[in-house]
Every structure is written in C-alpha cells, then in structure tokens.
Amino acid sequence: MFRKIVSKRGYIFTYEAIVIAFIFLSVFYIGYMVYSHNMLTALEEKKDTEKFHKALLLKDYFLRNNKFPGKFYNKTYLDNFTNELDIKEKTFDLFNNFSEYKGLIRFIIYPNIYDEELDNISDEICANDGLQAITYNFSSNTFKIYSNVNTTFNNANLSISGMDLIYFKENVYIPKITGMKYGDSINLYGCNGDHIYFKVNSEIISASARVVTNNGNPFITWQNWRYATPILIINNLNQNLNDYDVKIVFDSQSYINSGEMRTDCGDVRFVDEDGNPLSYWIEPNTIDTPHTVAWVKVNLAPNEHKLIYMLYGNPTATTTANGDNTFPLFFDDFSKGNLDNTKWTYNFNNPLFVNDTYPNGINFTYLSLDYTYYNNHNYIIYDINNTHISSISTYYPNTSVRFHANFHKKYEEWGGFYININGNDYNREVITNYHWGGEWLRAESSVLNQDYDSYIILQDPDLYDNWHTYEIQRDGGSSVNFIIDDAIYKTIYSNIYTGDLPISFYARKYDYSTKYGYYPVPQDEQNGNISIDWVFVRKYVEPEPTVTLLSSDVIFTVNGYIYKKPLKSVFDNIDITPNLNVGINEIRILSSPLPVEFLIKTNENTDFYYLTLSPNNVTIVVKP
C-alpha cells in the first residue's frame, strides 16, 4: 500500500516518488560535478601544455640566438676563421648579450672535474697572446673560460623569480678557449671530451701532444725514473685531513712482467705536484701481485682535489718505504726480531720470532703468539692463562688498525682494538674465536658486559692456518667496519665502544669451565696460536678520500686519425705531425684523465686561429 503526502495546496505525493526524485537529483548532481571536474582538468592541462610549449619555444629561441660565435669576437677572428668552420656541435656562447632575456630566462653551467684540471694549468693557457681567464659565478659554482675577448659581462647570471618556472637540461658545447696568435708556434689545450679547431696558413714542421699538470716540470730531480702515473685524491669532507694515510692499489705484477718496475717495487716513489717526496709504505706481501697496496701520507684541505704521482722505472733504485714515517700513530713489522718496549707491553719472556718467505720471494719475520709454546717453556711472567701483546698507546674512536696475521687454531685467539688487562674485558672491537662462539672466527664489537655484544660469524675455513690481511675501522660511535683482504666487508652498528683503546693480540689457554655445546675440543685445537707479520694504526674518517689512478689510455683523433697511448708517463710526447695540414685542422680528445697540450710549430711566423669547444651540462630556467 502506498503512503501518501498531501500538501496545503492539495497536491498528493507518495514517498516512493520523493525517493526517486532524490535519486535522480543526486545522479544529476554527481554527473554535473564529474563533468565540471573533467572540464576544469582539461582546461588546466591545456593551460599547462601551452605554458610548457611556450617555455620550450623560448628555450629553443634562447639557444638558437646565443650559439657560437657570439657578438663580441674580433672581426678578423670571425672573417678568417669561424666563418670557414663547419661546426656540427650544438653550441652555446657566453660572449653574447643576454639583457633581453632578463626576467624570463636564467642559465646555470655546472663545472666538472675536467674543467677543474684545466683550470690548474691556467697560467700556461693564458701565456698565449692576449688570453685571459674570465670567471662566471653560478650560486656556489664557478665556471671559467679563456679568451682574447676583453669584455666582461655582468648579465650572465640572469635573475628570474616566480613559482611557475620550468627547468631544461641541455648538453651543449661551450667555447672554452678562443683566440688568435702571431708567431711560429702555438700551444693548444683541451681535456676529456673537448674538440679543438685551429687554422694555420704556413707549413707545419712539427707537432706533438703531451698530458700536462699545473707544474711544467715537477720531476727535475727524478730524471732516472722513466714513468710517472698521476693519482687523483679527493677529500670528500669539508674539513682538513692532516697526516692522513690514503690507500693506493695498483697492479705491480703487470709492470714487473713488462720490465717497467723492479721485482721488489724498490723503485716505486710517491711525489707531490712539485716533485717533493711523500712518505709511503707498501704492504710487502702484496708486491708482484695484481692487488699491490701502498699507503701514502698526505695533507688534504677541505674538499681538495690533490694530484700526486707514483714514479717507477729506475732499475738501480732501492726502496725508501718507511712504515714509521708513514704511520705516525703506530707501526711495527717485527723485522728487527725483537719487541720494541717503547711500543708494546707483553707478559712473557723470550718472544718467538720466525723467518719466512712470501710467495713473491721476499723474506719476512713474524711474531708467534703460541700459548702452548710459551707455557711449556715457562716463559709467561704473569696472567698465566694467556700470552698477549698490547700497544702502550691507546687510540681514539676515529682510527683504524690493519694487520697481516695467521689464526692457526679454532679457539682462543684475539686481534684488534682490545682493552688492556687493567680495563674492562668487554670494551673491544676485535677479530676473535673466543671459544663460546664456536669454531669460526667472528667480527665482534662489545661494550660494558656480555649483555652488550654484537658479532658477525665469518664462516670460512680458509681463514684458519692461512695469512690474511684484516682491518678494523672505527667510525666514532656510529659503526665499526671489519675488512678481510680488501674483499670481505662486514659492518656492526650496535654495542660500539666510544673510548680510547689499545691494539692487542691474545692467544689464550683453552677455558674448560664453559662448554656451550662445543666441548669436547680436539687437543691440538685447544690453545690459541696467532702469528703477526705487521700491524699499523691510522686516522679514519667516513667517507674516506677517493683515490683514482689516472693510468688509463689517452685517446684522441687528429683530422680523423686515431691516437691511443697508455698514460704511464707524463714525460713522453706523442708525434702528430704527419696528420696535420695547412688550413683548418680538427682534434678531438676522446679520453684523457688529464689536460692535453698540443704544441704546433711552423716554418715561419704566421697567424694562428684556435677554438676549444668543451661539452657541458647547462640548466636553462624559463618563466613562460
């Protein structure tokens, strides 16, 4: 039965009719809202598309109007050189007037590592007639070009503001070096990725290429060394790093096999850019291997890019490596066959030293901490349940210890940052196989007591009865890195001791009082026995400086002819004379970690015109 509603005017409605009307109105309203939303969205999208299209057109117009050559070059330079060039590269020239774009466009040029290396030899570049360095500032970045144009611009940093800004990133070639010179020779410069064009109207009698640094001849006192490998060190922190030891890894085996290096690396030297010798030490067990490890002590300014050199190739040289000078915090290689009382404390008499030979044929002496040996001979003076050595000095929590050791037994051996006998036994960052943890070595960090202990099991049987290099890096209270042979990396982030700790090595008597399911233990595995070849302590920060050997090939083309030379030496020039012509020539540097200098000589005085185009990332900000 339908229920009815009677209005004052006498109209009769049913509830069902009202519900249907309400549903109809709701559907209509929702449909209208959806339609309106879609219409507004479409309008906004159309507006955004038009805005982006306008910005794109403005950006393209900006680049097209400001390509090379700009408006301020010498007319002779333009008429006699650039008008003859058939430049295919997409260029952007800073020698233009950008005032018409003020408030509409701003651009930023980001310098790269190759620009910085080229800036290091700015004095040599500016030695060409009338050439000057012009610096452009983009926020915290600076970008330099070298030119004989004498106009300085203040409108390169165009101002722009607002919310609706659109950013475009463009890869373009910028005229990095431009100029003219009259004479019988010219020095041209470029770095990785650069294209060099030059014009000469006289006969070229000689032309050569060489990599360059900011010092014309830093090796005047090293003339008996045939090779010099550049090494770039970058301080990644905004702080000074003084007397900081950096690790340099190189393949001495390949150098030795090719007759370029002594078999014992005795001719290896490290020098700074001025040719001054640097303190260094080479891990002797890595000599004549593909993974030769050298440590060099350097001073680094905040965020500094430092270039040093590894010299080699002198068959009559003998080593000057010195661990004590390289690692002022601590170093010992036990080569004298005694324990230095100024470095170590120990609890036994008659330390056992053993002479041995590495696989590379180099002799060495190591200290043996064999508990059974010292106990059977009654050599232990005190603390008779172990034999140990501990450094007299303690080291703050931003240091690293590195040692070459052999863990012979499966139980009761310790090595690393470990508190002395008068301190808390649980304050430590060590490599250990203390028997409660089972038969495997462990990377362990603990503090205060047994309830605050973190460890990582190193389940590798090769770690026993074989020599390995271990490193423990303490990054304050943040973390501890455990590294084996520069290949296995483990990190612990909890239960880290933040106080000073000595360096200690322990070989303990097996503890029968606690079993933990690992008992019985074979008799020949019960007492600790660890051998130590060498050990040192150095400063440690994170991130560490980046070290790059710039020993790659230098590859460039001269008028299409490819030159490929190994960058083993900065001494040797490369003859490129046969492939140069009278007129316009093109050189493309395809790969080079250092700037390259090209010396061109003619048979008479003549006009030289030259251009170096450098690939760069340019961000163009547009306000449509």
Curated annotation (Swiss-Prot):
InterPro entries: ConA-like_dom_sf, DUF2341. It comes from the Archaea. It is a single-pass membrane protein. Its main location: membrane. It is found in: Membrane. Keywords: Membrane, Transmembrane, Transmembrane helix. GO terms for cellular component: membrane. This is Uncharacterized protein MJ1470. It comes from Methanocaldococcus jannaschii (strain ATCC 43067 / DSM 2661 / JAL-1 / JCM 10045 / NBRC 100440).
